[in-house]
A protein has these predicted regions:
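Amphipathic, interaction-prone secondary-structure segments
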Residues: 38-94
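N-terminal domain-onset segments
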Residues: 1-63, 102-164
């Protein structure tokens, strides 16, 4: 976890809850990328933009009925357009193929509740709670791709040590 994102969670979680309560589910609940962008927009990028949700790189690692999604999310940088590995955060989530085995699909489709699709509907109180829990999981799964200290270590290797 990234400490500044955890701090942002405690600062903005009520805003996220209000967002879920006042926006229809198709605005954030149809896929994990939209959910991640909502977490970035409402939690992390408030009060200032830290991550650039418009440049997220998404990868589905398996393309089968279940597996892992990973995302590379660049930090905002006013000095250059191309991020380096130090400027990126990665996030991951496991997914399933149906509302019984996939968290987001289960919330959206109302699995175990009313079994009504989320399209055009404001979420129920229990769905808001579940979206909040999933948002927290996404935030907890965000990690720096490489820290500045790790990057510096790469440059501190002495040529002579490897060429003996």
């Amino acid at each position: 976890m990234i400490k500044e994102y955890v701090d942002a969670w405690f600062r903005n979680r009520d805003k996220l809850k209000k967002y879920f309560e006042t926006h229809t589910q198709e605005q954030y609940g149809q896929n994990y990328t939209d959910m991640l962008k909502t977490v970035i927009k409402v939690i992390i990028n408030d009060p200032e933009e830290i991550l650039d949700e418009t440049k997220i790189i998404e990868r589905n690692l398996t393309n089968y009925y279940q597996g892992d999604y990973i995302w590379l999310i660049p930090r905002k940088n006013e000095y250059y357009d191309e991020p380096t590995v130090v400027d990126c955060v990665f996030c991951y989530v496991k997914y399933g193929s149906c509302c019984g085995c996939d968290t987001l699909m289960g919330i959206y489709e109302g699995f175990g509740e009313d079994n009504q699709w989320g399209e055009g509907l404001l979420p129920s109180e229990s769905r808001v709670r579940d979206y909040m829990y999933l948002s927290l999981q996404l935030l907890q799964n965000m990690k720096p791709l490489m820290t500045l200290e790790e990057a510096r270590q790469n440059y501190e290797i002495k040529y002579e040590d490897y060429m003996k």
